[in-house]
């Protein structure tokens, strides 16, 4: 796992005090843990956040408040970046343009994810965020949260 390798190298330099995780793939996360990984620190599990978001009702004012806090015109790109949100979890395997979630669910997912990540940043107080290209709603919003808080992001 590339994150394990990067973390180990950073730990050897003494540059890491604590680590938090945002994990998007449930089965990959399970395999990682079964292989003996030590997910020290807080773990934000995307599938739990998405499920809470799907049940959440949001108002235009709440969405606007998050857009202002994150310094963006709209939260929509975070959802569009993650084709699983609009086209389902098999979107990367099968081409099917049937909408997978309602607009209400998507709004709830965006706000729930932003709120969860903002609170996780409050607890962790990170100096740096490591990630790949932001292709999940959480990756994208973590980047926006980090940027809004002045935290360095290393893709």
Q: Which residues fall in each region the model found?
A:
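Histidine-anchored nucleotide/phosphate-binding helix
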Residues: 1-14, 141-144
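Gly/Ser/Thr-rich loops at beta-strand to alpha-helix junctions
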Residues: 1-2, 25-29, 132-139
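Well-ordered alpha-helical segments embedded in enzymatic catalytic cores
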Residues: 2-5, 112-116
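Conserved N-terminal ligand/cofactor-binding loop architecture of enzyme catalytic domains
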Residues: 9-112, 155
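Conserved nucleotide-sugar donor-interacting segment of glycosyltransferase catalytic cores
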Residues: 116-155
């Amino acid at each position: 796992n590339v994150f394990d390798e990067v973390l180990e190298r950073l730990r050897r330099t003494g540059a890491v005090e604590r680590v938090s995780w945002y994990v998007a793939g449930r089965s990959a996360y399970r395999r990682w843990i079964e292989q003996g990984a030590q997910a020290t620190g807080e773990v934000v599990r995307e599938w739990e956040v998405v499920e809470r978001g799907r049940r959440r009702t949001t108002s235009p004012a709440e969405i606007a408040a998050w857009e202002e806090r994150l310094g963006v015109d709209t939260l929509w790109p975070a959802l569009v970046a993650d084709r699983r949100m609009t086209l389902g979890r098999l979107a990367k395997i099968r081409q099917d343009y049937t909408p997978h979630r309602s607009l209400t669910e998507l709004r709830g997912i965006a706000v729930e994810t932003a709120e969860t990540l903002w609170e996780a940043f409050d607890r962790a107080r990170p100096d740096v965020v490591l990630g790949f290209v932001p292709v999940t709603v959480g990756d994208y919003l973590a980047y926006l949260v980090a940027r809004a808080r002045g935290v360095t992001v290393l893709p």
